[in-house]
């Protein structure tokens, strides 16, 4: 099977999110161990990609992992060089003109500086596909060469002849050398919404196959991004390419003069429907040096990548949040990473079961993505640190809807969550009372139970650190108004899992209901009926009822 070239990110590690962190505090032995592990992971991905045309990891995450390895090697110079990711990507055929990489511009300031120093510029979408060199002689396609290591590649001519996007003949007798991107055709693909959709891997797999079938061949297009021995004028190159049967280049090339022009087209191609996946834009200067002088990263072209859809980052800590009902939610504290316009420092794993299945621990590297409504979520665990840091998780048997009615040791989180619910909009809607207020009262030792605040007056509140006279008066007034709330509102504030209760609800009548009576209520099924019945049987509830009765809450 033919080896496949992986398009390695050649940008300086300075611009990669994975490299922005300081050097790890490792001794040499630990550094060698961690670097060796990451090298082995990258080697596995490279082997699958280059030899089998399989992409085992998202391209963004691969690029960031490679940048992370480069950063570690700079931190620990005595550990030896990492293998060249392209060492096995070369092939027996030499490119007639070197396949170059691209300098990556980190931000708008870098783009503005690059533009200001050049003239006669053009912008094109940066197609997320597989690079190829085409050689025509006497009008006939002679060779199609994989990118390989940029200098040599493999013979793709047989499969290239099966692609309708590559003409078998050109109406030009002279030698024509074209460099471009084979891409997977997509229907109205919006990069901002759909991401790369695995497009690059599909093309890589297809071109690695020994026999390309007709249906697959029809899905592969070609975007010619350079004609090394073509006309000097960009307009002439674009027009002649279209006439020769390569229309995409002209359709998706625009002249630019300013950062504003470049920003417009970058945003347009990011959010508008296109027939291919992209991962940024390419800025090109019309004038180029002779092809024999092209370098690995030319000064006359640069890439401005799109915001990351997936980012590689380090897990700094694993915390556990215990909610009002005893639900345990694992939270990952992350090394800050930018995703689109969000700075992500923390994300939720949703459930204790999921954390246990993933076994995420401090030091692990994870891929983070934005889900609906720009909510960060864990995409995958990319690799794990060799030394597994211990994590003490709460015992789920200890926490449930009937636990932590008082701030006993280990109950601080659930008890505070009960207070926040009680005072919030879904409960008593206590004006000016939030988590900070409850925390201050807890730290002052004034809340031995869930309703002890009913007995606090302004004088007592004023003694709490951080609560002055004016705020104490407001809190006392808010607490006093709570006594006038109806019983139904109080029961919901205490955690009764019912959407609606009769306005003139009576405690004794509700507590005496059996399962059938609860299920007679609209929207109450067997499970909810059991929860409602269990609520009134909670051991702490009689004492709370007495507090309500003492302050005159009707229906108690």
Curated annotation (Swiss-Prot):
Keyword annotations from UniProtKB, A to Z: DNA damage, DNA repair, DNA replication, Ligase, NAD
EC number: 6.5.1.2
Gene3D superfamilies: 5' to 3' exonuclease, C-terminal subdomain, DNA ligase/mRNA capping enzyme, Helix hairpin bin, Nucleic acid-binding proteins
Enzyme class, first EC level, given as a word: ligase
SUPFAM superfamilies hit by this protein: DNA ligase/mRNA capping enzyme, catalytic domain, Nucleic acid-binding proteins, RuvA domain 2-like
Record-linked InterPro entries: DNA_ligase (IPR001679), DNA_ligase_B (IPR020923), DNA_ligase_CS (IPR033136), DNAligase_adenylation (IPR013839), DNAligase_N (IPR013840), NA-bd_OB-fold (IPR012340), NAD_dep_DNA_ligaseB (IPR050326), NAD_DNA_ligase_OB (IPR004150)
Family as reported in the entry's similarity comment: Belongs to the NAD-dependent DNA ligase family. LigB subfamily.
Name listed for the protein in its UniProt record: DNA ligase B
Source species of the chain: Stutzerimonas stutzeri (strain A1501)
């Amino acid at each position: 099977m033919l080896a496949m070239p992986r398009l390695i990110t050649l940008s300086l590690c300075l611009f990669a999110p994975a490299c922005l962190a300081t050097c790890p505090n490792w001794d040499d032995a630990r550094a060698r161990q961690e670097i060796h592990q990451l090298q082995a992971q990258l080697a596995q991905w490279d082997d699958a990609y280059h030899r089998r045309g399989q992409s085992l990891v998202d391209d963004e995450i691969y690029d960031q992992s490679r940048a992370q390895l480069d950063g570690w090697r700079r931190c620990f110079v005595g550990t030896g060089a990492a293998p060249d990711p392209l060492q096995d990507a070369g092939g027996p055929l030499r490119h007639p003109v070197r396949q170059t990489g691209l300098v990556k511009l980190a931000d708008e300031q870098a783009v503005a500086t690059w533009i200001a120093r050049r003239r006669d510029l053009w912008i094109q979408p940066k197609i997320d596909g597989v690079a190829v060199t085409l050689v025509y002689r006497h009008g006939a396609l002679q060779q199609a060469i994989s990118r390989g290591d940029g200098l040599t590649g493999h013979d793709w001519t047989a499969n290239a002849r099966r692609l309708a996007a590559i003409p078998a003949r050109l109406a030009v007798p002279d030698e024509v050398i074209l460099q471009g991107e084979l891409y997977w055709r997509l229907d109205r693909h919006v990069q901002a919404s759909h991401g790369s959709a695995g497009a690059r891997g599909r093309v890589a797999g297809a071109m690695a196959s020994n026999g390309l079938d007709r249906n697959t061949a029809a899905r592969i297009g070609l975007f010619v991004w350079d004609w090394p021995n073509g006309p000097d004028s960009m307009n002439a190159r674009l027009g002649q390419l279209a006439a020769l049967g390569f229309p995409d280049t002209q359709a998706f090339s625009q002249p630019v003069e300013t950062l504003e022009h470049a920003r417009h087209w970058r945003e347009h191609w990011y959010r508008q429907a296109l027939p291919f996946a992209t991962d940024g834009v390419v800025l090109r200067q019309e004038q180029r040096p002779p092809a024999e002088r092209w370098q690995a990263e030319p000064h006359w072209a640069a890439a401005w990548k799109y915001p990351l859809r997936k980012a590689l980052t380090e897990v700094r800590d694993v915390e556990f949040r215990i909610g009002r009902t005893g639900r345990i939610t694992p939270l990952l504290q992350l090394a800050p990473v930018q995703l689109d316009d969000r700075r992500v420092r923390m994300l939720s794993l949703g459930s204790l079961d999921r954390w246990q299945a993933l076994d995420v621990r401090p030091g692990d590297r994870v891929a983070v993505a934005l889900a609906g409504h720009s909510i960060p979520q864990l995409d995958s665990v990319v690799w794990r640190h060799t030394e597994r840091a211990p994590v003490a998780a709460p015992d789920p048997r200890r926490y449930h809807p009937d636990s932590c009615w008082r701030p006993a040791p280990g109950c601080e989180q659930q008890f505070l969550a009960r207070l926040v619910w009680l005072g919030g909009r879904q409960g008593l809607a206590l004006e000016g009372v939030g988590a900070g207020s409850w925390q201050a009262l807890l730290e002052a030792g004034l809340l031995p139970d869930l309703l002890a605040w009913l007995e606090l007056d302004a004088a007592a509140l004023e003694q709490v650190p951080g609560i002055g006279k004016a705020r104490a008066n407001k809190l006392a007034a808010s607490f006093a108004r709570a006594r006038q709330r109806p019983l139904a509102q109080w029961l919901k504030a205490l955690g009764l899992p019912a959407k609606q209760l009769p306005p003139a609800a009576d405690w004794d009548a509700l507590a005496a209901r059996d399962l059938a009576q609860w299920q007679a209520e609209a929207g109450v099924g067997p499970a909810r009926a059991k929860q409602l019945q269990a609520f009134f049987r909670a051991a702490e509830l009689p004492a709370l009822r007495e507090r309500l009765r003492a302050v005159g809450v009707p229906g108690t």
